[in-house]
Amino acid sequence: MEQKENLEKKNKFILGGVIMDKVCVIGLGSWGSALALTLCKNGYEVHMWTRNEFQANEINTTRENSRFLPGVIFPKEIKISTDLESVIKDSKIIVLAVPSQAVRSVVKQIKHVVKEDQILVDVAKGLERETGLRLSQVVKEELPNNEYVTLSGPSHAEEVSRFMPTTLVAASPNLEIAEIVQDAFMNPQLRVYTNPDIIGVELGGALKNIIAFGAGMCDGLGYGDNAKAALMTRGITEMGRLGVAMGAHVTTFTGLSGIGDLIVTCTSMHSRNRRAGILMGEGKSLEETLKEVDMVVEGIVATEVAYKVGKKLNIDLPITNAIYSVLYENAKPEETVRTLMTRSKKNEMEEVVNNGFVHN
């Protein structure tokens, strides 16, 4: 009842013409744009930043992000600017909606204007290539005194921007801050849960891209539903195995940022990672694949980072290792599948068996 009253209150703000707190979105890609539309619908004063003056002028004039969200109209209340300082000033929440490899450079750029009471919300799903760090760790190195929330889950911008039913998770060790972000984004079409396990939520969002790439590769090779089901199921096991070794709670991988995001990314043509996998399964080179997808494919870097972390921690990651060999060692996709299928026999629940859990 209380949540319903809060949602109705937000709608009254809009209908009454009253604007709530200012928030800003850094980045004008598809996901940042979709979240800006959500925040605007919820009654917030939304400002977006891009360094691309042409893109800013186009959206301010035509009210459409033709590059990333064609056909979706931006309300006039959303302001687009190339002036970073004015966009950030007085914003209660700063949404970082840039590719994972750009997060550090963007945070370095904004940290001289960010105040300590502003909440940072990262929505990228990746790991930093040079350091192997999660994005919350990257941001904390640059802005150690700000509260930080990861917003993740099974969500395609193409659907969120059209206000189709979607669920997300706001993760932070500080649940009070996570609830502020939860309240900011919730509406009748977007349900947001909270989770204190930010490590697990971040890793779920990053690692599922590796498995989605593999699922796409299976499609490109012409394999059926059986192969994809096996890959997804063993993939979530692998995600949990690496996640726990990196400090996550295994149950997080059964939630929205784990199984939830894995399902949507492995099965939808909205998924860049799956599309990239399809193209490489069909025989295209990595260079040809990236040119055709023409957007950031986070799973490519995530594969490299996870492979290196797995080797360092001595974690068994057969699917990740196989995809790494395709991306970075020029292995043939069909050969890697054969290698996976002909490995030595194992128990399905290897960890359970090794811990002595056997029914009499």
Feature map (PLM): residue ranges:
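Internal alpha-helical scaffold of NAD(P)-dependent oxidoreductase catalytic cores
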Residues: 102, 113, 138, 142-146, ...
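NAD(P)+-binding Rossmann beta1-loop-alpha1 motif at the extreme N-terminus of oxidoreductases
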Residues: 16-72, 82
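NAD(P)-dependent Rossmann-like dehydrogenase/reductase catalytic/cofactor-binding core
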Residues: 215-216, 244-254, 262-360
